């Protein structure tokens, strides 16, 4: 019998490669907990690519069990799921094999079960969970849907997103009430769960970043870059609607203002599955935009950039891309939504801009002023290194999981 209490951690997808913010946050938390108070069993779908991921798996858990993914994410099934009482994203996560695998693991009576993302509650057994239970949320999902409705381009899309928001809010409330503790990734999200959804048992952990992995290497250069052109970078999964919306807004409203003052400036967009429509539109307009698609490591792209831009108008939770760029030494221009939930100070750790005119002006301000670029980059990195290591975040999560567990 293990001397340590057993923790069962259920992820809705295989965690490697770390190609999304959710996977990065989850693996950072698990790495921070590995070797600590718990013996950790990770449960998730099998690796989809058939590659050997044993070393990566061993870095986050003591044991790994899986199920073969049997979800149906076809366009036709997405359309049918609009008629479901569940939000589409939750309906698509339903898996008979997943439910059976989780039920078998719970039957072994671990001391704690953690479900990663609110969607994963659809895989949990009905009725009260048999052991201490923790729900790890990464966003306020219903708020994301509401913001998608706000920025939708036509009445039909707005109506669909509003319907999905209502379904998601109901699902979030019902799911969270089943857990002993709900973990949020920002005080703002925690307040929403308490005040809007009536969830009392909410705890908050900070967002962390591995400052050793994302090593500080600000781009050299003490010049005004507007003449020769600055290199901008955006990182993020390009199959996530808020990222698509943000770049479409940048294309339509702000980019022309930037290149009017700095004609040779270019943008590199680093992230999986860029929509063909967006890529084609950038080419049609002759924009100096490069879409990399999926990359193994974003660091070289951010190191090579002069400014990281985050033109988000929708989304939720906290954006790991912000901390990654700051840790690497790349100054950030962001909307309020882009840094939402992160305890950052505008004009100290990043430059804030809301409308298109201000966003373009903020980018140009950084390109023109090498001292400002250096000051913003250094202050942000120093702040992150002192306060937000993954080990600190992992230990905070561990303490929450230990509550009520006999040691």
Feature map (PLM): residue ranges:
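Acidic anion/phosphate-binding donor-loop and adjacent secondary structure
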Residues: 146, 209-224, 279-280
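Nucleotide-activated donor-binding/catalytic signature segment of Leloir-type glycosyltransferases, i.e.
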Residues: 262-300
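A short, well-ordered alpha-helix in the C-terminal region of glycosyltransferases
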Residues: 372-386, 393-396
